[in-house]
């Protein structure tokens, strides 16, 4: 617990990807999101592909990572569809692509599809020297499924495993983050996301192994007394 009290607000801010992914998102809200990211020195912003141009116009050259989502939020679109979506995101200038695992394929034990898709998308993203995060939707996965997902992530050499979309099932929790940290290779990082609304939870997740925090309540989190 000492770690929680030692981390400064500035240090916490450097972990946060300020996120807006709701379906009725407006351009004004994206602009506010980006301005807040600059004001509070957040690590990145996460927005839908549709809003990438708007985010890049504001944040280009600031050092704030531009993050978007692929196959969001259910992950069951085809690999070809995800590939084309990822290509567009890269063309528009995204730095990080957060890709939802094919949850339906996992639940039907179609691990060949899961593995082939992750490998294909990882090669595409890495060919452009960008970052891929695999959204594992941990709250919907059994221990066995999560173990297999971590093995595929290790073999495919994704950059991050991300805990949740924030849409399906429970969000991030300390126990799960600590567990996947043990299963992942040391060079694969973790993004905790989903239901993170307080500074204390964010710090506990970082202590458990999270390298980034995805949150929509970021400003309230870092300004709470």
Regions found by a protein language model. Name each.
Residues 9-40, 52-57, 64, 69, ...:
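Alpha/beta enzyme core
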Residues 1-6:
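Short, Lys/Arg-enriched N-terminal segments with co-localized hydrophobic residues
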Residues 191-195:
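Short glycine/threonine-rich catalytic loop with a Thr-x-Gly-x-Asp
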Residues 43-51:
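N-terminal low-complexity or amphipathic/hydrophobic leaders
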Residues 74-81, 222-225:
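Short, charged, surface-exposed secondary-structure boundary motifs
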């Amino acid at each position: 617990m000492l770690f929680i009290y030692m981390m400064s607000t500035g240090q916490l801010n450097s972990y946060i990807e300020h996120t807006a992914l709701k379906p009725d998102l407006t351009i004004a809200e994206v602009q506010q999101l980006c301005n807040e990211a600059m004001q509070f020195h957040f690590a990145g912003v996460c927005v839908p592909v549709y809003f990438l141009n708007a985010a890049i116009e504001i944040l280009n050259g600031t050092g704030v990572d531009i993050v978007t989502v692929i196959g969001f939020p259910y992950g069951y679109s085809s690999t070809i569809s995800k590939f084309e979506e990822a290509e567009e995101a890269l063309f528009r200038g995204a730095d990080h692509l957060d890709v939802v695992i094919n949850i339906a394929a996992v639940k039907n034990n179609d691990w060949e599809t899961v593995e082939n898709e992750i490998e294909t998308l990882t090669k595409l993203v890495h060919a452009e020297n960008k970052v891929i995060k695999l959204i594992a939707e941990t709250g919907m996965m059994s221990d066995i499924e999560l173990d297999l997902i971590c093995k595929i992530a290790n073999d495919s050499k994704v950059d991050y495993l991300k805990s949740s979309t924030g849409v399906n099932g429970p969000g991030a929790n300390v126990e799960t983050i600590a567990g996947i940290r043990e299963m992942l290779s040391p060079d694969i990082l973790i993004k905790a996301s989903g239901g993170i609304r307080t500074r204390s939870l964010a710090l506990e997740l970082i202590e458990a192994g999270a390298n980034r925090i995805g949150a929509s309540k970021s400003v309230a989190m870092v300004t709470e007394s």
